[in-house]
């Protein structure tokens, strides 16, 4: 995170960085290696693991920010009937700068409408200030109630709703980000 001086003419992230070394990078008018991370690439059948791919890292000089964790996959079959392997259990989301949202489950192997413990952990690897937050947990429900992915300023929400009809089975919202505006 950037450090905002009281005299600088821009708006900084509300997650302020450290004003002193060693966590500070002082910049001068020269070239710096910069990599802008990308979102995770999709997976498609017949992959045996449908957990989403994680995003790639972003780099500025010596500072690396981890990409977000891939989301968990849906597990189970239609109308609560488990499908053949490998679609029997919902996968756990992956850890990352922000954690991925946990997959949903539609199976008789867990009580209906039970939250699953399958969210991805944010701020992985752990650093200070934090890179991001945890994803939300998925749910055992008929209508694909996955958890939301974590954001920079808040975690992803758990899936909610009764889970027996489409309008009442709700996936979790993704966590909020933060804004920075540097001009001049």
Segments predicted by a language model, with ranges:
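Glycine-biased low-complexity/repetitive sequence motifs
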Residues: 1-184
């Amino acid at each position: 995170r950037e450090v905002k001086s009281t005299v600088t003419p821009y708006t900084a992230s509300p997650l302020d960085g450290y004003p002193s070394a060693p966590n500070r990078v002082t910049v001068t008018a020269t070239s710096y290696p910069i990599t802008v991370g990308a979102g995770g690439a999709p997976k498609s059948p017949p992959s045996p693991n449908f957990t989403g791919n994680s995003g790639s890292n972003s780099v500025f000089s010596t500072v690396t920010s981890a990409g977000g964790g891939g989301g968990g996959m849906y597990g189970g079959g239609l109308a609560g009937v488990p499908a053949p392997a490998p679609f029997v259990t919902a996968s756990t989301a992956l850890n990352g700068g922000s954690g991925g949202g946990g997959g949903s489950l539609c199976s008789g192997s867990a009580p209906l409408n039970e939250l699953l413990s399958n969210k991805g952990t944010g701020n992985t690897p752990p650093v200070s200030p934090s890179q991001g937050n945890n994803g939300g947990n998925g749910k055992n429900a008929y209508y694909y109630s996955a958890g939301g992915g974590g954001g920079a300023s808040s975690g992803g929400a758990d899936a909610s709703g009764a889970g027996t009809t489409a309008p009442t089975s709700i996936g979790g919202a993704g966590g909020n980000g933060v804004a920075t505006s540097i001009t001049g």
